[in-house]
Each structure stands twice: as C-alpha cells, then as structure tokens.
C-alpha cells in the first residue's frame, strides 16, 4: 500500500501518511497528511514530490532511469 503524500486526505487511514508526515484535522475541513514540525528527510531517503523536505546540506536528487529521487549531499 502506497503511503499518503503531503496535503492528501488521510480520512480512515490515519497511520498511512508518508514518513515525516502526520494526519491532521484541519478546521472546517477533512483530515490531511501534514509535515511534522522540525522533521526532515535524511540522506538517501526517497523525496519524490517532497523536494523541500530534505535535511540541511542535502538536496533532492533525480536519479537516472526510472529510479525514485533521493536526498543526497549537495555537490
């Protein structure tokens, strides 16, 4: 089962948000996966669709072929 990405609904799937995200009930709205404050993706973690979530000193690197992007040291 794919994890739920940032800003997508997590109604009935509270524990399925992607790493570093938590299910949050917005006022006057439904529950969505939001970033956990202070969390960042460490080196070699997948960052597809989460380019700004890599930790300091890392950037989301698009690997060749159909491989997923990962957080890698800034060259």
From Swiss-Prot:
Q: Gene Ontology terms, cellular component aspect?
A: extracellular region
List S-S links within the chain: 3-18, 10-23, 17-33, 40-55, 47-60, 54-71
Q: Which Gene3D superfamilies match?
A: 6.20.10.10
GO molecular-function annotation terms? Answer: ion channel regulator activity; toxin activity
- Start and stop residues of the Domain repeats: 3-33, 40-71
- Tissue expression per record: Expressed by the venom gland.
The similarity comment for this entry is: Belongs to the psalmotoxin-1 family. Double-knot toxin subfamily.
Q: What is this protein called?
A: Pi-hexatoxin-Hi1d
């Amino acid at each position: 089962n794919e994890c739920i990405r940032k800003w997508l609904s997590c109604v009935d799937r509270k524990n399925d948000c992607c790493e570093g995200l938590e299910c949050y009930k917005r006022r006057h709205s439904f529950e969505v996966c939001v970033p956990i404050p202070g969390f960042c993706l460490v080196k070699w973690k997948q960052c597809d669709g989460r380019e700004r979530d890599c930790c300091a000193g890392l950037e989301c690197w698009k690997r060749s072929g159909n491989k997923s992007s990962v957080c890698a040291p800034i060259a």
